[in-house]
């Protein structure tokens, strides 16, 4: 009996075996152990990798195969070309001649690139064959108007700047950023004696070498332009003796030439441009002529209607008009462009789309075949 446990001894408190740690250290071990056990349980229940796709497919019931659905192919869309050619800095510099005085003149590059092609605005040749164009001339006399012209007119409208415009290079860069093709107005002596401040005009009263020097001074006023705009017919454009050194300088530097000539007779400048291989365009359409019966809005609509007229066997027409910058003209062009977007008979293209390039001109282009690409 003495060896039998007394009451309560069978339920004596269990004690850790001798040699195991006790106290705070044991508590830390217990917490660490519980944490590891919980982490393992969570990994097993939550983060276990999903069954393989092959297993899921094998376990799924077989389904009957269906015929593939044949969708209609989308029509091919030609990627829209960049408005201007992407020229590297080296290519641009190669089209610039730096004079001993530090002036920068345009020139034909070593590879044969001519500025009148390199700086022309691109357009989609797959559009309607009938083409219209707009050239706003004498831009720069009024800064507020010039800003509206550049910022608000459609990019297809080409701009001809007065060479005496202050900070002209900056304004021409801004025009390019808004997708406008740019030109310089040729400074020709006005019979009424009105001229631009700081610009020496080309004159029938001086010799050819002096006129070339004055033309070069004008060329240095900006960069990235296609060529020159001859504003009105007169002694400079009508006399071959006066015009030849001027057109030759334009040809030698790879620039283009535009004439505004309402008369039916070709000028000496046109004949020389053909002979010397200059890219050339001419118009007799002055849209803001004050005595026009239908006003500017009517003249714009008439230009598009006449160009879009067609009948079998007749080639597509093209024409461009010129006008001066003013607020009414800007508003009229913006509204006209919106009307033009709702028809498909004519396309609005920059003035380069109205240039002609005859045999000698084409021979010069072939020296750099990339110039023939649209």
Give the ranges of each region predicted by the language model:
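Catalytic beta/alpha-barrel core
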Residues: 135-139, 159-164, 207-214, 227-239, ...
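Alpha-helical scaffold elements lining the catalytic groove of polysaccharide deacetylases
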Residues: 198-220, 237-242, 271-312
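Terminal interaction modules at protein C-ends
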Residues: 2-129
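Active-site groove signature of glycoside hydrolases
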Residues: 216-236, 315-324
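C-terminal domain-boundary segment and adjacent tail
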Residues: 250-265, 269, 325-374
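Catalytic grooves of carbohydrate-active enzymes
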Residues: 235, 303-346
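Active-site beta->alpha N-cap acidic-glycine motif
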Residues: 113-196
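Hydrophobic faces of well-ordered beta-strands that scaffold small-molecule active sites
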Residues: 132-136, 157-161, 182-186, 226-230, ...
